[in-house]
């Protein structure tokens, strides 16, 4: 089997992934509230919206601007003293994201390696629902210090949660 070298996201101490097996369970709301709570207790926090197909951070934080770039790196947008990045900052809200796996993987690598995250105690990663290319890229390449799986209490949903937990092991 192939061995993967997992690296931390540059400029960060701890990476916390917020994931779910299904959409619409409150994952993005939880991720933003966790980021705000950590900020409130004095931590330096970043929030990465890794949901390429359905980014919600621009709406949740009312961000309508585009990040600055020096041609090599993207500068996170600061809102509520939290460093933020989302594909939603780079595309029009009406533009459908019809990307295949390699494009998604490339975008995730850009957000984890080419964003100028600065001196963060925590970066909260709002993952898309399910176990697709985004989750695989993170699980294989990024050092994840903790994962929180958000779910509803139905038995079938909890079975999916167990599978999701194994992915981050």
Which role fits each region the language model picked out?
Residues 91-134:
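Cytosolic-facing regulatory segments adjacent to core modules
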Residues 14-51, 165:
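Walker A/P-loop phosphate-binding motif and the immediately C-terminal alpha-helix
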Residues 114, 121-122, 128-169:
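Conserved catalytic-core segment of NTP-binding enzymes
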Residues 9, 54, 71, 101, ...:
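Amphipathic alpha-helical transducer elements in NTP-driven molecular machines
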């Amino acid at each position: 089997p192939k061995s993967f070298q997992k690296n931390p996201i540059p400029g960060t101490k701890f990476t916390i992934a917020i994931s779910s097996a299904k959409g619409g369970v409150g994952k993005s709301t939880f991720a933003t509230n966790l980021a705000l709570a950590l900020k409130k207790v004095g931590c330096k926090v970043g929030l990465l919206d890794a949901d390429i197909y359905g980014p919600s951070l621009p709406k949740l934080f009312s961000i309508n601007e585009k990040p600055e770039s020096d041609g090599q790196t993207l500068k996170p947008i600061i809102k509520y003293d939290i460093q933020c990045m989302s594909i939603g900052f780079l595309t029009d809200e009406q533009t459908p994201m019809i990307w295949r796996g390699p494009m998604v993987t490339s975008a995730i690598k850009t957000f984890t390696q080419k964003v100028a995250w600065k001196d963060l105690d925590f970066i909260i990663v709002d993952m898309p629902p399910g176990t697709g290319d985004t989750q695989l890229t993170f699980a294989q390449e990024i050092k994840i210090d903790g994962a929180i799986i958000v779910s509803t209490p139905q038995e079938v949903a909890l079975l999916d949660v167990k599978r999701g937990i194994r992915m981050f092991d």
